[in-house]
Amino acid sequence: FSTIEQLIEIKTDLWKAIKSFSNKNSGKIEPTYIVNLGNSLKQQFRIAEAIECYDLVNKFNLDIPQSWINRSETLIMLNQVSNTFSIQMLEQIKRGYENVLLSKQVPPIWLDHYKEQIVFHKSKISEACRDAGIEPNPLDSEKTKDEYDKLSSYRKFCLENNLSLSEHGLYCQCMGSSRDNLTIPTAGGIVGDFVIPMEMVLNRLKSEFSFSRHLYFEYLTTEKDYELLHDSCFSELFNDELLGIDVEKLRTAFRLCFGILDKIGIAICELFDLYPPNGNVYFQSFWQLDRDNRRELFDSNKSPGLIALYSIATDLNEKKDGELSFLKQLRNDLEHEFVVVYKSESPSDIYDSYKFMDNIVFIKEDEFLEHLRRILQLLLHQ
C-alpha cells in the first residue's frame, strides 16, 4: 500500500485516455491503451479485468505481442494467488507464448526466453496429465466447445458476459466453469478459524449476486408480461417512463450490487480488524489510508486481494477522481431521488408531469443496462 497511489493515478489516467480517444473517434478504442490498462490492472491484482482487457485486444488479431505476454503472465499470477491450476490454464499460458513467437514486433534477443517458457509449460502439462492419469488431448478445444454447447442458456449468458463466479471461467468455457464454485482459498489445505465465517460471508454475497445477475438475465431474455402491466393500472401520462415489474428488476439488481460492496467492506474490517475510527463502512470510502496509521495496518496484511479491492474502491470514489464514481451517484439517486428510465431517444412529456420536481434524474434504458452490467462485472472481479 506504500506505492499504491501512484498505480491508482496511472490507472485513472489510462481510463481517461481510453474515454477521450473513444469520444473523439466515434466510439472506437485504441488497442494499445487497452493493453496498458490491462497491465496497470494486473499490477493491482485485478486479474479478471486484466484478462478481459487482453482478450479484447487479442480478438482484433493485431500484432501486439504485449497482450499475449501479459495474458500468460496474468494466468500465472492467478495460479499463484489462488493456489489452484488446471491443465487448460497451462495450455493457455503456453499458447500465449506461442503466439508471441509469431509476432514481428518481438526483439530477437527475447525469443529464446519465450521458447524456454513454451518448453517449460509443455513439461508442466505432461506432468499434470501424468498425475491425473490422462493423455494430452490435441482436440481439447473441440471438447470444450461441445461442453459449452450443452450448457443452459443462462450459464452461457454468464460466461459470455464474464459473470460466472468461477476462477476457471475466467479463461475457459468448459463444463468446469458451469457452476459458481468460487470458495475461500486455503493454502496448503490448512483451515484457519476465519475460513468458516468467511465461507458464511461468501454464501451471502454469492446469494445476492446470483439474484441480481438473474434479474439482469430475466430482463434481457424474458418476454414482457403485458397482462401484468395492464393489471397494474398505471395512469397513461405519455411521458415515456418505463414502469412495472420488469424495469424494477433492473433497479433492484443495481441497488443490490452496492449492498454487496458494503458487505465486502464489513467483511474486510472484521477479518483484519480494520474498522475506520467512526465505525461507518461504505465500500468506496472506509479505507482512509491517510488517517492515523491505517496505511501501515493495511500494508502489514500483505494481501493481493486487499490491494485489488482498494483499487476498485478508488474507481467508485468521487474524491479519488474515480472513473466509475457515477455508478455510486446513480445508486444514491435510485435510493433518494425520482429516477426515470426511458426507452426513446429523449423522454416526451405531453402533460408536463416532470415539471413538478426539479431534481428528477433521467437515464436511457440501454445506458442503465450497460451500467448494471459494469457493476456486476466489478463485483465478480472481487
Where are these regions (language model features)?
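Short, hydrophobic, well-ordered secondary-structure elements
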Residues: 202-220, 239-272
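Acidic, Ser/Thr/Gly/Pro-rich intrinsically disordered interaction regions
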Residues: 78, 86-91, 98-207, 241-247, ...
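Flexible helix-coil transition and linker loops at the boundaries of alpha-helical arrays
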Residues: 3, 7, 11-30, 58-64, ...
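Single-residue signature of alpha-solenoid repeat helices
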Residues: 10, 50, 86-89, 93
